[in-house]
Amino acid sequence: MKGRGERIVMVSTYDHLTAKMVDEAGVDIILVGDSLANVILGYQDTLSVTMDEMIHHTKAVSRAAKRALVVGDMPFMSYQASAEDAIKNAGRFLKEGRAQAVKVEGGRGVMKKVEAIVQSGIPVMGHLGLTPQWVHQFGGFKVRGKTAAAARAILEDAKMLERAGVFSLVLECVPWQLAKLVTKKLEIPTIGCGAGPYCDGQVLVFHDLVGLTASTPKFVKRYADLGGPMKKAVEDFRNEVKTGKFPTLEHSYEMPAGEVKELAGARKRKRRG
């Protein structure tokens, strides 16, 4: 798509219902992100989500996706320990989760694992910049690559990942000037997440872009505000149940009059007996 100048659209989502919507909307890639941890499962950060949880949700998304590429996000410690772990767990995403590719966070520190996964025949999407799995190492959720030295390091990591065989690269929370430079220097497409307008594609979390989350980062644009109306719908349901307004006969099933009469007669006969 990069060669044709066509922008890539990627959305992160985690269940069959929303994945079906996203797929039908014409999105190119569905990422089952490790943000499943805090968006859906209620964890404080992405470090807590397990392989089994990721596979479970990837299965649901894959069953919904008819046209979009499904990418499974390798969770924390599913690939860092060894190349063998990396290959095994990446393989689970394809074999069990029915994804077509995996995403791996990190640069030179995970290069051998990325190479091993690629050489095993599994497509890999890279991820540089703000990498949440490395948040403690980098001192928190901050924009990366703001100095010339830090930017050069990210650019070099990007080139190394391309040589290692990744088919695309997510750039998260980096200055737009750096993202533009990386995009220009690489032959593979870049997908921005808070990386400005010059990447080859963009990604947002479904729940952020439709307004289901309470707060969002600066780089998120809300295309709807569904959280409020959804909450109100539940409140209206609660109120109508409490006051007896729901359900009405309109929402009820009916027995034919003859059967009602027969039932009443049977009950009378039973009482006499």
Where are each of the predicted segments found?
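Alpha/beta enzyme core
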Residues: 1-224, 228-257, 261-273
